[in-house]
């Protein structure tokens, strides 16, 4: 039995680590046709508030930092004033990786695990959060994902160059959860290497670390277009 197996076994029997959340809502919503997706309303409340409320009421999450645009810091602070787990609302950086790093810096010293969440995934559930946090507690890094339904093509110059086996493909969602020190180190290395990363898992993967995949939720969509927003509203109506 190797040391990694022993370490993972010990993690599984220890109490759940103190987990903070960084909710990233600092984008400019360029694909939303003039709609500010951070403040877009779903069932009468801004999308960021709905996302934050789910983390506020999830037992696995102990504290929250929200990262947003400078013009939204005060409005979001007021909207989330009732959420006692929200410890800070901070201004984001030039890109997602920098914004996540700024959020990590605002967490308390108690935090050992961190869940990084897209603010634009307002239909996240306690079940997915809890499942991912527990997997990260055991493995050090975890993310929810769902199987890809469409056939995916790799295209170069407008011509198909290959077709990956669909059975090996998963669409990764958030929250992506990590040991805090692991994610900090991974983001720093990506920054030092000037590497382009598309999500937080990518930074960790670059260091040769494995990310545990857990069952995601088809309804945990990311709202990036007006059509996505319309679908999110329909899904919420369906819940009533």
Positions of predicted regions on the chain:
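Hydrophobic helical membrane-anchoring modules
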Residues: 2-4, 8, 220-240
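Short phosphate-binding loop-to-helix
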Residues: 81-113, 195
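Residue-level signal for inorganic ion chemistry
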Residues: 23, 48, 103, 117-118, ...
